[in-house]
A protein has these predicted regions:
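Sec-dependent bacterial lipoprotein signal peptides
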Residues: 1-19
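Beta-strand-dominated extracellular/periplasmic modules and repeats
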Residues: 21-141
C-alpha cells in the first residue's frame, strides 16, 4: 500500500516544494528614498523594510539610516539594497542622538507617532521590483 500513497503524492510534490521556497537567486537592488514628516524632511532615524508574508515575501529585512536631509539608502546585511518582493515599512526617530559607546542609555522621546514603529499598524507598504534601482519616498503625517 505505500506505493499507492506515493503515487498520489508524487504529482503534488513539485507544487509543495515550489510554495515553500522563495527566489533567493535574485540579487538585492538599490533602494533609496526620502522620508518626510508633516511636509518636512525627517532629520534622523531608521527605516526598516520587513518582508510581507501575506503577499508571499520572505527573507531578510532591509534597513537604512535616515540622514539629516531625510534621505536613506537600504542595506540587507552587508549588501546594499533590498531583495525584490513585498514589504511592510516601519520608521523610528527619536529626539536627540544615540549615546556614545560606553555611555548609559537614556530614554529619548519619539519624534513620530508610535504606529510607525509597528509593521502591522504603520500603514506603509511597498513592492521592490527586481532589475533596477528604485527611489521610494514616504510622507508621514
Amino acid at each position: 500500500m505505500p506505493t499507492t500513497w506515493l503515487r498520489r503524492c508524487l504529482p503534488v510534490l513539485p507544487l509543495v516544494l515550489a510554495l515553500g521556497c522563495g527566489d533567493s537567486s535574485q540579487p538585492p537592488v538599490p533602494v533609496t528614498g526620502k522620508i518626510t514628516y508633516r511636509g518636512l524632511p525627517l532629520q534622523n532615524g531608521t527605516i526598516v523594510f520587513t518582508p510581507d508574508p501575506r503577499k508571499g515575501s520572505s527573507g531578510n529585512m532591509a534597513m537604512g539610516e535616515i540622514k539629516a536631509d531625510g534621505t536613506y539608502s537600504l542595506r540587507t546585511g552587508k549588501d546594499f539594497g533590498a531583495a525584490p518582493g513585498h514589504y511592510r515599512i516601519t520608521v523610528a526617530a527619536v529626539l536627540g542622538s544615540p549615546p556614545s559607546p560606553g555611555q548609559p542609555y537614556t530614554y529619548q522621546p519619539s519624534l513620530l507617532p508610535e504606529k510607525y514603529r509597528d509593521p502591522e499598524l504603520s500603514g506603509l507598504f511597498c513592492e521592490v521590483k527586481g532589475g533596477f534601482a528604485q527611489a521610494l519616498d514616504f510622507n508621514l503625517d
